């Protein structure tokens, strides 16, 4: 299993390897649990939120330590695929 922040970090690294600029812009202040994002995942999570790769859980939270489901991984991977095709 992987956490949501691990999933996003993996996707950001793949995007960077594929030539996408993954420089983080903005912050995660809109999410009440932004402070729970690990330091290693902060830039990746910020990039993923601001590019639409990942969305919150619908309750104002990112749930970075929560387990990433297969559906969440498939959805975020498809969003990254769409970004790479643009």
Where on the chain are the PLM-derived regions?
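Catalytic cores of secreted/periplasmic or lumenal enzymes
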Residues: 45
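Phosphate/pyrophosphate-binding loop motifs in nucleotide- or prenyl diphosphate-using proteins
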Residues: 52
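Acidic helix/loop microenvironments that form the catalytic cleft of cell-wall polysaccharide enzymes
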Residues: 68-72
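Feature responds to low-complexity, polar/acidic, surface-exposed segments characteristic
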Residues: 1-42, 55-67, 79-86
